[in-house]
Amino acid sequence: SYPFCWRCDTPLIYYARESWYIKMTDVKDKLIKNNNTVQWYPESIGKGRFGDWLENVQDWAVSRNRYWGTPLNIWECECGHRHAIGSIAELKEMSGTCPDDIELHRPYVDQVTITCPHCGKEMHRVPEVIDCWFDSGSMPFAQHHYPFENKELFESQFPADFISEAVDQTRGWFYSLLAISTLLFDKAPFKNVLVQGLVQDENGQKMSKSKGNAVDPMEALQKFGADPLRWYFYTNSAPWLPSRFHEKAVVEGQKKFFSTLWNTYAFFVMYANIVNFDPTQHRLEDCKLTVMDKWLLSRLNTTVKAVDDNLSAYKVPEAARALQDFVDEMSNWYVRRSRPRFWAQAESDDRTAAFMTLYTALVSTAKVAAPMAPFMSEEIYRNLVCSVDKSAPESVHLCLYPAYEESRVDKQLEAEMDEVLQVVTLGRAARNLSNLKNRQPLQALYTDANSGLGQLYTDIIKQELNVKDVQFLTDMSQFTAYTFKPQLKLLGKKLGKRLNDARQALQELDGSAAKKELDATGVLQLSLPDGDIALTAEELLIETAQKEGYTSVSDRGVTVVLDTALTEELIREGFVREIISKLQTMRKEAGFNVTDHIQVYCQGSEKVQQVLEENQEAILHDVLGDACHFDALEGYTAQQDVNGETVTFGVKRV
């Protein structure tokens, strides 16, 4: 018949007590009117949960029978007269016992009496203190000691542009702010409210220390860092939805965004240091930009605008995901495609354009990410900017948000590159299905993607997917094998004894030609011994299978087919690429610098030795090798599996 505390299971007994009230029912219509001027995120909370609360508003029991708290500013006389004191000056004016340095808390303020203007007797402060939510609701003006001072400062900041709290504050802070502001100013104290959902455990249960499913925030910060923890909440779901916290998702965000951004930054720093690149000595406007440079700068500015627009609309996940997508494309597409330009030893316009493009993108990314990932953004900014430009703001958080440069945006270029990316992604998926590494060259790729893509894009697809040829087709059915069978439930009665003849005729069909005929005319003509018949698609069972030697993958209306047949020449090229990959890995394992030249040693498989000997020039060029030796092993050695062939390589710094 009575509730229990959900934390300690103590019985909660209600006692009826006298209380001081604010008659909120008298301003109900004003509360509703002012709430309608606020932009709520989501709107359903403002119009629904909070709106319903206002529709059924009750008078506010504002007093508490406690010792700690703001003393209720009402003095009472035994004659029945009551007076609300409005300032220290008024209290001193009406009292002969008020010290100059009065402390406005119990017990000191309780010792101050005032003279009753009606009967002349002493008036004493009532014993109650004020509901702490009244203190919270007074924050907009109390923080500035308004109206006693800072009038202009208060008016410049009121109403607030934005506040945010958990959904349970519809009856707490959101309400107390609106209630007091309506009583005093007859307007809402805020323009925008972003409501936050509660954080739950990974199973969707409320976190509780007693249940043992609570996560210590400080431990999580120590384990993951502040930035990844913040990023998880930004990208996980809309802020107002309950959020299931689990460590795997935080780690995934670390890898997907922070590791990717940091590795891209580290790549730039490493090669910039190697060639002593100084961004203050160049201007992006003077650079001869390639298509890849123009694409990255276009995507950068599209992202700057997308993040700005989404944050302005309080769409936090959309803003964070837009930035995350850009970082992924910058790293896994632009840097991947442009690596050789950064490796170039000789200074050139092309190398300068690559460095300036990536530098611009990284600095702008740090500025855009600063509100969401403040610590990593600061580290990147200070090293990239402050270390070379002493006149720059000393912190990324003192910088202006990057300006959107519409002149840099090329929507057609972005659309075309997006289509190329889609083809490459589908091609990689097809390789995975066929269990073929990207280092193994293939003869051809076929796709029904936009045939208007120019030679530049075709070359990119060839290089990325390691194929010799790319063909754009309108009809991809030639790579699918179609077989036809009779739909027995329908054709059994219709054909009777002729059913076996129809089955035999269907088995002998050219599947691709039959499918085209059916698609074009809606019927399939069959010649039987006793005459022709026409069958509809509903009367047929049509089975599809990929033709042998081809692998296809489709998504978003685009199909990609790989010719997976391997000739001896393709296999040999695959060996060359595999050898290069193994040697590059060994360079890294041996701790060599990217500029170090090496000697290469090889013993073991005759096939691998033959491939290495026949392709020495190309292999040594890619691994910075000066010579190849087959009579001994020196330096750092490791046994390797090269496409099923066992061989031992050695790499030695020159």
Language-model region placement:
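Residues forming anionic-ligand binding surfaces in small-molecule and nucleic-acid pockets
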Residues: 25-47, 156-157, 305, 553-569
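Structured mid-domain segments that build the active-site/substrate or prosthetic-cofactor binding neighborhood
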Residues: 235
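Feature 926 captures the class I aminoacyl-tRNA synthetase adenylation module centered on the KMSKS loop
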Residues: 52, 56-134, 138-140, 146, ...
